[in-house]
């Protein structure tokens, strides 16, 4: 037993040692670059899935192991750790820093919730819509962390409103009972002595009634101190928490910058297929936005039915008088919005830069019309989405956060202190350096698989899968990704599977986007467990949910997500990217055998 305790305490260390030693026969017995690269891939994948080492530290292992096995030089590996992705990430984080610093995100969220009203069903839809919108531009984690305190305040107001309503009803009950006793005493005074004698026990029962009323009051007071007044209140709290967790993830699907998995895929894809010009911010938004909207609405219906039931009559009843709960919710949201005051100069500037950046992203090369990138036609492919992000990011360090001059008491105008919208220290606190290193490690790993020939070998071995229908291959890969992402981090999942799925598509002569796009979207479908992704963990920490609640709700959302992705792939996405044809930008795989 003591040995088991030691093993449990040192489990991470033992896992690292055992993984390295157990897999070591692979490169020792099969002496080839493919086997050596496969060994490195298995070791890194094991560490990423189990988190025996921090994810970003594991991502540095290619820089150590590839030179040791003679697959790539240190200089070559190091160059893979900083790509166009990192420039795009820096620009986006500058925007996110300014949005959160000046509370623009809170203003947007509260305004959207106020627009939809406080009916429980519409309130949850309002929270989901605002959270999803913010998650398109901010990280899923920061979005969930920002919205949850507002949701918690609304949940507390719902509970207190219920207590107030019940207290009002109890007061009315006691007053009615007292009036009834006075009437009884008048009638008793007019009756005979014999009747009075018979009514003495009845008078005693009136005291009992008073005791019962007192006892009921005590019980109500006891319940008032409890966390929830009723099961419905508890279900409402669960519903709102899960709505925030899931909508922050769903909203991230919509843009390339919405979540790290989209960014990782985009950079991997552009690196492997540099001649493909079909994937950019605008085209990604056009195909993913319908997926996100449909999934958001279906998730809302599913969660509403699961926790509160779905009463169409109550939802769409016109002229309905607001309940005490709904009035309390509206008051909380209104108070939170009023605390922000009028829109400030800093918020306006941030919003303008945000809108301009989004418009430039959309119009750079939309595909159906000529974009502004033709202005740089002499250098095709040089200007990317990261160029726009950097221009916007630099503006946040240049534009002053307040007036540059002020008037003294004597009427003189003097120069005032200059401070930009954001500072480098503030940017650093928001910059996810661990994700930047993790993505760099994924690029290095993909380069190693390409240089060693492992990618080509995997592709040749997977070519027999070409006999299966394309829809079945997509479904199988989507289900595998959805299952794996529940136990491994989303960035690690896409980083591990991209070097496998790309050769698979090439080997069976299918447009790589046909398999990679649904797999990338499904990588974000980590809805089952609190540890599956940070938004789940954030909402779980508020104490309203049990694991089984998240499993039941998440299983339904997972199924809906895969179904919506499959629907999209064979309806609007297929003609958008011409997926039924094998593209010229994808290489033809020549079958290779492993020595």
UniProtKB/Swiss-Prot annotation:
How activity varies with pH is as follows: Optimum pH is 6.5-8.
Major subcellular site: membrane
The UniProt entry's GO CC annotations, sorted and at most eight, read:
apical plasma membrane; plasma membrane
From start to end residue, where is composition biased (Basic and acidic residues)? Answer: 208-218
Extract the ranges annotated as region (Disordered): 190-218
Q: Which reaction does it catalyse?
A: sulfate(out) + 3 Na(+)(out) = sulfate(in) + 3 Na(+)(in); selenate(out) + 3 Na(+)(out) = selenate(in) + 3 Na(+)(in); thiosulfate(out) + 3 Na(+)(out) = thiosulfate(in) + 3 Na(+)(in)
Q: Give the transmembrane ranges.
A: 13-33, 40-60, 77-97, 113-133, 134-154, 239-259, 283-303, 348-368, 381-401, 464-484, 491-511, 512-532, 553-573
Give the record's GO biological process terms: sodium ion transport; sulfate transmembrane transport
Name the record gives this protein: Solute carrier family 13 member 1
Species per Swiss-Prot/TrEMBL record = Rattus norvegicus
| Topology within the bilayer | Multi-pass membrane protein
Q: Which family does it belong to?
A: Belongs to the SLC13A/DASS transporter (TC 2.A.47) family. NADC subfamily.
- Name of a matching Pfam family: Na_sulph_symp
Q: Tell me if Ribonucleoprotein is a UniProt keyword of this record.
A: no
Q: Which GO terms describe its molecular function?
A: monoatomic anion:sodium symporter activity; secondary active sulfate transmembrane transporter activity; sodium:sulfate symporter activity
Record flagged with keyword Nucleus: no
Functional description taken from the UniProt entry: Sodium:sulfate symporter that mediates sulfate reabsorption in the kidney and small intestine. Can also mediate the transport of selenate and thiosulfate.
Q: Which key words are in the record?
A: Cell membrane, Glycoprotein, Ion transport, Membrane, Sodium, Sodium transport, Sulfate transport, Symport, Transmembrane, Transmembrane helix, Transport
Q: Which domain of life is it from?
A: Eukaryota
What phylogenetic lineage does the species belong to? Answer: Eukaryota, Metazoa, Chordata, Craniata, Vertebrata
């Amino acid at each position: 037993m003591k040995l088991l305790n030691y093993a449990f305490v040192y489990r991470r260390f033992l896992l690292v040692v055992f993984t390295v030693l157990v897999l070591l026969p692979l490169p020792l017995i099969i002496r080839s670059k493919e086997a050596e690269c496969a060994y490195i891939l298995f070791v890194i994948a094991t560490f990423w899935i189990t988190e025996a080492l921090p994810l970003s530290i594991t991502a540095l292992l290619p820089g150590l192991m590839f030179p040791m096995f003679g697959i790539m030089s240190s200089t070559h590996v190091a160059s893979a750790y900083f790509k166009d992705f990192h420039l795009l990430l820096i620009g986006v984080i500058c925007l996110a820093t300014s949005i959160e610093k000046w509370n623009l995100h809170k203003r947007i969220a509260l305004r959207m919730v106020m627009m939809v009203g406080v009916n429980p069903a519409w309130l949850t839809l309002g929270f989901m819509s605002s959270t999803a919108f913010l998650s398109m531009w901010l990280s899923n984690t920061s979005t969930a962390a920002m919205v949850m305190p507002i949701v918690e305040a609304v949940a507390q107001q719902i509970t207190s409103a219920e207590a107030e309503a019940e207290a009002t009803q109890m007061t009315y009950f006691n007053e009615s009972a007292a009036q009834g006793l006075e009437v009884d005493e008048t009638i008793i005074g007019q009756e005979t002595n014999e009747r009075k004698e018979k009514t003495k026990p009845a008078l005693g029962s009136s005291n009992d009634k008073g005791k019962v009323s007192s006892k009921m009051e005590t019980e109500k007071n006891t319940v008032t101190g409890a966390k929830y007044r009723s099961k419905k209140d508890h279900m409402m709290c669960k519903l709102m928490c899960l709505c925030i967790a899931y909508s922050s993830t769903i909203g991230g699907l919509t843009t390339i910058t919405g979540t790290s998995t989209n960014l990782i895929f985009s950079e991997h894809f552009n690196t492997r297929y540099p001649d493909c010009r079909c994937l950019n911010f605008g085209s990604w938004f056009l195909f993913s936005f319908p997926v996100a909207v449909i999934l958001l609405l279906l998730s809302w219906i599913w969660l509403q039915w699961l926790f509160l039931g779905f009463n169409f009559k109550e939802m769409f009843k016109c002229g309905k008088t607001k309940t005490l709960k709904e009035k309390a919710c509206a008051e909380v949201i209104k108070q939170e919005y009023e605390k922000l005051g009028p829109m400030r100069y800093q918020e306006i500037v941030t919003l303008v830069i945000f809108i301009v950046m989004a418009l430039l992203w959309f119009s750079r090369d939309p595909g159906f019309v000529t974009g502004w990138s033709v202005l740089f036609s002499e250098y095709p492919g040089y200007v990317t989405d990261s160029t726009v992000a950097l221009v916007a990011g630099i503006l946040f360090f240049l534009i002053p956060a307040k007036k540059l001059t002020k008037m003294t008491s004597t009427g003189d105008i003097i120069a005032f202190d200059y401070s930009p919208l954001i500072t480098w220290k503030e940017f650093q606190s928001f910059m996810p350096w661990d994700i930047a290193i993790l993505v760099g490690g994924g690029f290095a790993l993909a380069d190693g698989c390409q240089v060693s020939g492992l990618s080509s070998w995997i592709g040749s071995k997977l070519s027999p899968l070409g006999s299966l229908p394309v829809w079945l291959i997509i479904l199988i890969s989507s289900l595998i990704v959805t299952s794996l992402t529940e136990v491994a981090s989303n960035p690690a999942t896409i980083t591990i599977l991209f070097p496998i799925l790309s050769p698979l598509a090439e080997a069976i002569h299918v447009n790589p986007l046909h398999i990679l796009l649904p797999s990338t979207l499904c990588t974000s479908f980590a809805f089952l467990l609190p540890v599956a992704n940070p938004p789940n963990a954030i909402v779980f920490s508020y104490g309203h949910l049990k694991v089984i609640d998240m499993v039941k709700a998440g299983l339904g959302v997972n199924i809906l997500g895969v179904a919506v992705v499959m629907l999209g792939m064979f309806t609007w996405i297929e003609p958008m990217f011409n997926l039924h044809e094998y593209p010229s930008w994808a290489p033809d795989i020549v079958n290779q055998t492993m020595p």
